[in-house]
Amino acid sequence: MNPKVSIIIPAYNTEQYITQCLESALNQTEQNIEIILINDASTDQTLTLVEKYPDSRLKIIKNEVNRGAGYCRNQGIQAAQGEWIVPLDSDDWYAPERIEKLWQVAQRENADLVADNLYFIQDEKYDPNATLFSVAKDEFSQTREIDVLTFIDLNRKPGKISPHLGLTKPLIKRSFLLENSLAYEATVTPIEDFLLYTLCLLKGARFMIIPEAYYYYRRSRPGSASTFRKVKILNQFCAVNRYLLEQDSVQSNPALKKIIDQYLKEVEQEKDYYSIIQPLKEQGVLKTLLKTLSNFKLLQLTLKQIPYILKRRFSQN
């Protein structure tokens, strides 16, 4: 008999967290599961720790070279036998009842995707300091369906005022992915989740969100990401939005096309902002000013960014 659910765990150099992660999957109240762990060429003790577990529900895939989370998740989907698949990052963990609760909602609502709230855990901390829906409790106080327009609009707004549903780790009907030839895009890490969920919605998926939190999401301290990494991620969001704008289902939907186009413009503006702020931090105001005045294109960009810079500055106070 095939398992109900396949839990897919890409793992790369997470020896500090992998035991808690894996045990949270093995100890689910829903026992009819399989766990597919993809060791992505870890150079620490991650694989050694995983291989200590004799549980027959655990399958290990070993990559000889590092491929990235999106590629590994696709390997997991290809190997999966479950009716449903669900991702778990190797530095995160599940509440014991997570799979059981999501599966029950999926059956009741005839859903293709079901996501829950997230507990946010700061790295090196033990207790949650917030949840994904903390900024929108009224909007997510009960189970609700999310359409593609709402999904993109919520992700477009600043995280301080809007939950980014691209961060969720939903239970996904495996047959829906296979029938629609959908998979993670490995080249846009770490936003491959956002793209996959958007494409599912464009294909007509029924995506349900529940207010309860059963997923513990570990994240770095605020502001720890480098400007280079921020710009890289923003470039990926630009590429993803341009790709979405090319889809027939977007072109035929004026409201959707408008909001994605607006999202693209906002991301491009954010990217330009960081291209100005980083030199200010590294070189100082005077040196950056002299460089800007000597470069007409950079001067144009800077002048264009002044209203946006002021808006960001006052919104943070």
Where are these regions (language model features)?
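Acidic helix N-cap motif at the loop->helix transition within catalytic regions
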Residues: 17-19, 44-52, 93, 97
